[in-house]
Amino acid sequence: MTGWIRACAAFILYLALGVAHALTVAELQQLLQGAPKSEARYEETRESPWLSSPVTTRGTLRATPQMLEKRVESPREETWRLLEDRAEWIGPGGGGRKQILFSQAPALQVLADVSRRATAGDLAALARDFDIVVRGDERVWSAQLQPRTPDVTRQLESIELQGTGNRLQVLIVVERRGERTTTRLLP
């Protein structure tokens, strides 16, 4: 009988050590923000009822809580900077510049804020406009974001973040008009 009890205790200990703790929103933010910041390669696919086929772009991303810079390498060279108050576009080789103030394009601000905050791991800021449900543990996780404020609900259907450890790997943005953008951050 003692052998049976020891075997059961060992099995329970094995299960307890092998199962990681389910993450909370605050823990996921801490995990993501604890990651070293650097540039990341990305591949982004945009699907839309207004496009005859999906459009895929590739390049590098650099993110901070205040800015997301997307340097597109293909299919054409360009740079997008999403700042807190505006979006900037720079054409190939630095030629041609445009900026859009978010005060003049509030719908664009919603999309820019989501992208900027998600890639920076700023879940606390996202929680102001979204209900966030985290699934998984520190090894493999996902976060579902459902809009809850009128401004965001008008633009977005849902957001999904997927990752492993302290690394965001996939950002999926589904817009109300049927558009879907899937951004994969590559190792």
Language model region names:
Residues 1-4:
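N-terminal secretory signal peptides that target proteins for export/translocation
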Residues 6-18:
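Bacterial N-terminal signal peptides
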Residues 18-41, 46-52:
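N-terminal leader/targeting segments and the immediate start of mature chains
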Residues 42-44, 69-73, 89, 143-149, ...:
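Short beta-strand segments that buttress and anchor functional surface loops
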Residues 55-58, 75-76, 153-158:
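Short, surface-exposed coil-to-beta transition loops
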Residues 58-110, 181:
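An acidic-aromatic
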Residues 95-142:
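Flexible, surface-exposed loop/linker segments and immediately adjacent secondary-structure boundaries
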Residues 123, 127-130, 134-187:
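Gly/Pro-enriched, hydrophobic low-complexity segments
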